[in-house]
Amino acid sequence: MSTAALVEGKIVQCIGAVIDVEFPRDSMPKIYDALILDGSELTLEVQQQLGDGVVRTICLGASDGLRRGLTVKNTAKPISVPVGKPTLGRIMDVLGRPIDEAGPIESEHTRSIHQKAPAFDELSPSTELLETGIKVIDLICPFAKGGKVGLFGGAGVGKTVNMMELINNIAKEHGGYSVFAGVGERTREGNDFYHEMKDSNVLDKVALVYGQMNEPPGNRLRVALTGLTMAEHFRDEGLDVLFFVDNIYRFTLAGTEVSALLGRMPSAVGYQPTLAEEMGKLQERITSTKKGSITSVQAVYVPADDLTDPSPATTFGHLDATVVLSRDIASLGIYPAVDPLDSTSRQIDPNVIGEEHYTITRRVQQTLQRYKELRDIIAILGMDELSPEDKLSVARARKIQRFLSQPFHVAEVFTGSPGKYVPLKETIRGFKMIVDGECDHLPEQAFYMVGTIDEAFEKAKKIQ
């Protein structure tokens, strides 16, 4: 469409990131239309029609220097971003513009960031397991190919490091394309992630979309949709794609900010009244169809470690597997700090993962649960008051707890020990030996920060 044909309007009010624009009454923009400020690249997205030709928009960029009376043009279509192979290896912003100073993105195709979720009869369920090489995840909450996974945790328990390790293990082994959406996280993490991908030579298979903490709420709200749109395009071309979001909570938070600016009444804990709908719109699109699959891993910040907060609670219902990171476990120095009793997966079913894996997982959880129940007694009366069976349970539980830790490739700088990738068979064999009592003679330190059970035996020899 030529710029001459664009309908023009005038700014009539600016309140922070919310801009009201007046258009001729017979040519008002539609909801979600993108408007462009004349003479600049600043984009506004229509959120409400107030009547009398006035629309209320949210600004996707800094609103510094805006004033009443400036001319705005209506593009008469929603925000569209480049999709396809030219986006791989590039860093883009919410509007799909490159921010890596490596020239323009030469993409033939663009796609609107607002898409309908696939119809129910187009969906394709999957039960094929996705091996991550992380013992605690493969054993307790295995991932499905084409499934949705959430990493839940408070501040500083290791969501981003866990996600980086998953990307490192899956993206390298997987060989397909990945899309990473950095939603309202630290720019430092975005930079680290870029270099991590570059150093491991998988950058040419990853599209990076960033709307970081320092950006206006409009950008943070829409950047998840931008990344998802790119992932959907690869899926619709018949590919299996990985979609990583860090952090889905910031998406909700940006929605809360926008909602308040638009003058909506807040609901529980001050969140937007449309929380469930906004989350549903995003999550229903992250799905696998008969054409291709999207396997998504989402980090979910848990405010004040409260899993019943409306934001994480709304996210729970959409996921196939939940990995809960616990501050108590992190404080023991056990990393990844995954809580084996709180984390769950829909794949934990003997018909899906097999009888042996299912039995071992349940036995490990029973042992840990028994230890949890006995902890108060031990704190008051000491170990001597326990029955011989309980003493054995506690000893095994402590070994299991330590064996659930693992050195990560992406954390080699901090730990000083090389990262370990543990195949699922080895994970099952190791935990089977512990619960069967074949490792009762080994000291519990031998199980800390090792890969396979054989390494624990080697470490025990050095200790003794």
From Swiss-Prot:
Leader peptide range in chain numbering: none
Subunit note: F-type ATPases have 2 components, CF(1) - the catalytic core - and CF(0) - the membrane proton channel. CF(1) has five subunits: alpha(3), beta(3), gamma(1), delta(1), epsilon(1). CF(0) has three main subunits: a(1), b(2) and c(9-12). The alpha and beta chains form an alternating ring which encloses part of the gamma chain. CF(1) is attached to CF(0) by a central stalk formed by the gamma and epsilon chains, while a peripheral stalk is formed by the delta and b chains.
Species the sequence originates in: Burkholderia vietnamiensis (strain G4 / LMG 22486) (Burkholderia cepacia (strain R1808))
Protein known as: ATP synthase subunit beta
Matches recorded under HAMAP family: ATP_synth_beta_bact
Topology with respect to the bilayer: Peripheral membrane protein
Source organism, top-level taxon: Bacteria
Reaction equations catalysed: ATP + H2O + 4 H(+)(in) = ADP + phosphate + 5 H(+)(out)
Stated role: Produces ATP from ADP in the presence of a proton gradient across the membrane. The catalytic sites are hosted primarily by the beta subunits.
Listed Pfam families: ATP-synt_ab, ATP-synt_ab_N, ATP-synt_VA_C
NCBIfam families in UniProt: atpD (TIGR01039)
